[in-house]
Regions:
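Peri-catalytic and regulatory segments of divalent metal-dependent proteins
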Residues: 3-157, 226-233, 240, 246-255, ...
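Residue-level signature of catalytic and energy-coupling elements of molecular machines
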Residues: 111, 220, 260
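Hydrophobic alpha-helical membrane-anchor/signal-helix detector
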Residues: 153-174
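Catalytic and substrate-binding regions of cell-wall glycan-acting enzymes that process beta-1,4-linked
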Residues: 250-273
């Protein structure tokens, strides 16, 4: 989260979002990079195009009677003033969850009926859930996730080629030494290097199947917390995470690196205890971009 968002005078919700989004250097860099339209960029755009779309005008799971409430919520949050192609819907489901779905023109934020009807839910907690999902959509987390995967895959292919080359080199040297000097070599130094590269390839490939990264989840949490903090209700997002509880974690069991509710609460508690913390990385990138 850009430090500029924290300095917006309360309460000006649309100005908060403008400051948070316009000063996000990593997102700005991605938008610039994706325009290169080379191998990794084309792969990311192709995968985004292949994702299923959500059609609010046709989807029968949407609770139509709650649409006015959803539209008002976006107005109260200042999101409706931003001019982004996004919408909010309550959808029928037995799962307590909130999610962001891509639409033809932008994205839709959805909250399930199971979650919306949970004990303890307040208007501000719903705002927190929406802010979290809005961050995923507005910061282009889907596309950035695909782009990171595409670049990582190319890195792995390069490392795989290096590993294969080292294998061939080690075998060639061993054969050469044995033939020329009658001294077989073990190739231990090469083996160690090859083993490290091979291990890196396996781990990084397994961890980068499509899903929000831990960093993206924490970033979306921070956006939600900072937004509610801006309106004087920061603790409510943490309460919202508590309401999600372990049942929410169970939905993401297949993602071994998806942060648990407990770890997300701990992260925000740390943020609460250290208000002096700033986004040094974002500030550094901004300085680099704006320097002549």
């Amino acid at each position: 989260m850009a430090d500029e968002a924290k300095s917006v005078t309360p309460i000006n919700t649309s100005a908060f979002w403008v400051a948070a989004l316009d000063n996000n250097e990593l997102c700005a860099k991605f938008i610039k990079d994706i325009q290169k339209n080379k191998g990794a960029e084309k792969e990311a755009l192709r995968k985004i195009a292949q994702l299923p779309r959500f059609y609010p005008q046709y989807d029968e799971t949407i609770v139509e009677s709650m649409q006015g409430f959803c539209d008002t919520l976006l107005i109260d949050m200042g999101i409706a003033d931003l001019g982004l192609k996004c919408s909010l819907h309550i959808v029928y489901s037995d799962e307590a969850n909130a999610f962001t779905a891509l639409t033809e023109e932008g994205f839709a934020m959805c909250i399930t009926t199971k979650l919306a009807l949970k004990n303890g839910i307040t208007y501000e907690i719903l705002m927190g859930y929406v802010a979290h999902e809005f961050a995923h959509g507005a910061l282009l987390h889907h596309a950035r996730g695909f782009y990171a995967q595409a670049k990582e895959r190319r890195k792995n292919e390069l490392l795989g080629g290096i590993a294969a080359g080292l294998n061939a080199l080690a075998a060639g040297m061993e054969a050469y030494n044995a033939a020329a000097y009658g001294i077989p070599t073990s190739g231990k130094d090469y083996d160690a290097t090859i083993a490290n590269i091979g291990n890196d390839i396996k781990i990084s490939t397994l961890k980068h199947s499509f899903k929000y990264s831990r960093e993206q989840e924490f970033e979306a949490d921070l956006f939600a917390y900072r937004f509610l903090e801006h309106i004087g209700k920061g603790e409510e997002f943490i309460n919202g995470l508590r309401i999600l509880g372990t049942a929410y974690d169970a939905l993401y069991d297949e993602y071994s690196d998806h942060p648990t509710i407990g770890s997300r609460i701990d992260f925000l508690k740390y943020v609460q205890l250290h208000p002096e913390l700033g986004n040094k990385k974002n500030a550094k990138l901004k300085k680099k971009r704006t320097q002549p």
